[in-house]
Amino acid sequence: FDRIKLTFNLKHDMKKLAIGVDIGGINTAFGLVDENGDLYAESVISTKKYPYVDDYPAYVEDLCDSMRALAQSLSFEYELTGIGIGAPNANYHKGTIETPANLWKFKEGDPNPDESRRVFPLADDISKCFGGVKTLITNDANAATIGEMIYGNAKGMRDFIMITLGTGLGSGFVANGE
């Protein structure tokens, strides 16, 4: 009984970290952060190495392997509380990336260029890599806006607009703190 209690207390006191992922048209960056937004480790993989619809499974495998390696690189124990992903054309409600302009296109002459094949269940795929840990996905510009509102230069602002520019163009709006 004491051993269980001790284990519970150790886990309760354990640092809680999450993985944040930013998927861009050229690179995918990810890092381990705490609830204060402090970054403990970060890494990147090439997104453009996987340009076609049929490359999506290999992309997920590379991302999962790289995220696992990063998660295991820390020299202390911690609890992984969740994974948050920002991606172009992400659907928060479905956990998918849907027909993104700069990702996973059809090869020239693809015999089945049906756009329904360009809906990618990334939140579920990544969650499975980490034993079912809660994984959420949202539009990358919205994720950047939320990050600025909580941790960045817009902290404390109730109204602002954020424009993101990368491989694509995006925006996020905050009105009355929402």
What are these model-predicted stretches?
Residues 59-74:
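Short, well-ordered amphipathic alpha-helical segments that serve as non-catalytic structural scaffolds
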